[in-house]
């Protein structure tokens, strides 16, 4: 594998799982993963393949380059650098008057993604990911696992493209153009899988978590969600139970969530597994 020297790059942002760098003339971005473990290589290779696939579908995303490794063992991916860009959540947190126009832009980008059918074998079905996550979750009994899978089978299959980590922090804007980023979780299935995740992050998580994700408080995140609903659903309101069910499935593929046992019990009893409602 090709190596890369970080002395030739300048860090410009840090996220929980990676640090981001620019080259000298800021034409390329380097995403350096914090975990030093070759087990992440398949995910990196998949992220590269998915980025190329997504571009071919007409969904705007920075052009992907190649995989490298630093001398101390960190894996990296190069991307086209989008100049003068900000994530939608960062821009809104700095000027909340941008919330409405930017949520309209995000809703339009989401409609393009969700309106695109995905038949590629490199993109997994969200139900398969859910079942895998459920099987690896030690806090779920065999009986509950069987009950949840039975419930899962009743969910519709649509086969549309899904971002997989859908929230305003994973959409950037530059000169009025919106790009989708961080596509390692890209999958296919029902659009509510994505929408439910945004609901969970904006309206369910406590304020401290939202400050970390969105750079804003719980109330502002809820207002942002409501504006997204306005433009994505065009006047109608999503069903709260549906949002919760799909968010539950998404969170099961991100199994570090400590709320999973409570979510499982409430979901099986037929109740929305989250205590808070959308603003």
Predicted regions located by residue number:
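Active-site activation/catalytic loop segments of kinase-like enzymes and analogous catalytic loops
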Residues: 195-235, 249-266
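ATP-binding glycine-rich loop module of kinase domains
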Residues: 17-44
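Conserved kinase catalytic-core helix
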Residues: 85-124, 145, 152
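Short pocket-lining segment of the protein kinase catalytic domain that shapes the ATP-binding cleft
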Residues: 77-85
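Short beta-strand micro-motifs within the conserved protein kinase catalytic domain, predominantly
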Residues: 63-75
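An alpha-helical support segment within catalytic cores of ATP-dependent transferases
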Residues: 2, 115-164, 168-169, 174
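ATP-binding glycine-rich phosphate-binding loop
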Residues: 2-24
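The N-lobe alphaC helix and its flanking beta3-alphaC-beta4 segment of protein kinase-like domains
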Residues: 42-54
């Amino acid at each position: 594998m090709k190596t890369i020297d970080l002395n030739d790059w300048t860090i410009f942002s840090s996220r929980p799982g990676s640090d981001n760098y620019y080259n000298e003339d800021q034409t390329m971005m380097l995403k350096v993963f914090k975990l030093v473990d070759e087990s992440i290589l398949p995910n990196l290779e998949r992220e590269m393949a998915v980025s190329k696939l997504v571009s071919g579908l007409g969904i705007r995303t920075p052009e992907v380059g190649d995989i490298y490794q630093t001398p101390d063992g960190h894996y990296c991916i190069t991307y086209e650098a989008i100049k003068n860009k900000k994530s939608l959540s960062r821009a809104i947190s700095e000027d909340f008057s941008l919330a409405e126009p930017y949520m309209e832009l995000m809703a339009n980008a989401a409609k393009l993604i969700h309106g695109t059918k995905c038949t590629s074998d490199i993109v997994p079905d969200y139900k398969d990911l859910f079942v895998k996550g459920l099987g690896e979750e030690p806090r779920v009994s065999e009986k509950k696992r069987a009950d949840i899978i039975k419930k899962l089978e009743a969910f519709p299959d649509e086969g549309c493209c899904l971002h997989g980590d859908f929230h305003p922090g994973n959409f950037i804007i530059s000169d009025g153009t919106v790009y989708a980023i961080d596509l390692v979780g890209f999958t296919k299935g029902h659009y509510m899988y994505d929408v439910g995740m945004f609901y969970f992050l904006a309206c369910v998580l406590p304020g401290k978590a939202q400050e970390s994700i969105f750079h804003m408080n719980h109330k502002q995140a809820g207002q942002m969600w409501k504006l997204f609903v306005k433009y994505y659903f065009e006047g109608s309101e999503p069903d709260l139970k549906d949002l919760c069910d799909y968010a539950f499935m998404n969170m099961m593929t991100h199994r570090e969530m400590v709320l999973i046992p409570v979510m499982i019990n409430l979901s099986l009893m037929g109740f929305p597994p989250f205590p808070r409602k959308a603003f």
